[in-house]
Regions:
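Sec-exported extracytoplasmic/periplasmic mature domains
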Residues: 62-65, 80-81, 93, 97, ...
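A cross-taxonomic marker for long C-terminal extensions/tails that follow the last structured domain
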Residues: 45, 84, 198, 205-223
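Short, surface-exposed beta-strand segments enriched in small/polar/acidic residues
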Residues: 107-114, 132-169, 187-200
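Periplasmic peptidoglycan-binding/anchoring modules of Gram-negative envelope and division proteins
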Residues: 116-149, 173-179, 216-223
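N-terminal targeting leaders that direct proteins to extracytoplasmic destinations
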Residues: 1, 7-8, 12-104
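Alpha-helical linker/edge segments of TPR/alpha-solenoid repeat scaffolds
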Residues: 80-91, 97-107, 112-132, 197-199
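Short acidic capping loops at alpha-helix termini that bridge into adjacent secondary structure
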Residues: 183-187, 211
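Extracytoplasmic/secreted proteins, especially bacterial periplasmic and envelope-associated proteins
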Residues: 36-39, 52-55, 70, 87-90, ...
Length: 223
């Protein structure tokens, strides 16, 4: 999913309809056909016809303009619903790679309420972390460094949000370093609280899930 300059995915907070809100008019197909494809995709996924939605997303990928994070997100979600873990993680890898290439990747982890550890059902996140560590190593291989930042919604006090977001960023950094020791000196963790909230309603539900994100972006290395 693309948010301005941000490329991100979400399977735990955002509504499925948001994950499927694609701008198909940018594809090299007619506007009428693009509109029809978008409607078919949304209906198939929200109607729980995941085999059909997967086929449609794969057909979009065959178009040169279809190779983008939002489409790979659809492939990821559809495969996950079908219990196809390996194809789902391959799609996640493409999302992570394209986000890193775009210099900013936003990912929604499902943290425990008010805490800096992941929710109990963290089964996809272990695989996410492994892939993110691989892509982070590639992104910093040329001597650049990376900032891992955490963001919160507008509910609660800002000092608390700042502290919580830093704890979450440090948690994600440590998970990455556990996978790739060479990342320890290349990643800095920062917490921004709600200062960069994108929705900023403070509702703490799926409508403002984008506010509670982890971002990966290039940063200057410490001298």
């Amino acid at each position: 999913m693309k948010i301005g300059q941000r490329c991100g995915i979400n399977t735990c907070g955002l509504r499925a309809s948001e994950a499927l809100a694609h701008d198909f008019s940018s594809f090299e197909i007619s506007q009428c056909k693009a509109h029809a494809v978008g409607i078919s995709l949304t209906r198939a996924y929200t109607g729980k016809k995941y085999q059909e939605s997967l086929a449609l997303f794969n057909s979009v990928l065959r178009n040169p303009a279809g190779d983008q994070p939002r489409v790979h997100t659809g492939v990821y979600l559809s495969n996950l619903k079908l219990g196809r873990r390996e194809p789902a993680m391959q799609a996640f890898g493409k999302i992570a790679q394209q986000g890193m290439d775009a210099k900013r990747l936003a990912v929604k982890f499902n943290f425990q309420q008010g805490g800096a550890s992941l929710a109990k059902d963290a089964s996809p996140y272990d695989r996410w972390v492994k892939e993110l560590a691989v892509q982070s190593a590639k992104a910093t291989a040329s001597g650049t460094c990376m900032e891992v930042s955490a963001h919160t919604g507008r509910s609660g006090s800002e000092p608390l949000n700042q502290r919580l977001s830093l704890q979450r960023a440090e948690y994600v950094k440590q998970r990455l370093v556990n996978e790739r020791k060479d990342l320890a000196a290349k990643i800095t963790a920062k917490g921004y609280g709600s200062s960069e909230a994108l929705v900023a309603t403070g509702r703490e539900d799926s409508s403002d899930a984008l506010d509670r994100r982890i971002e990966f972006k290039p940063a200057a290395c410490a001298s």
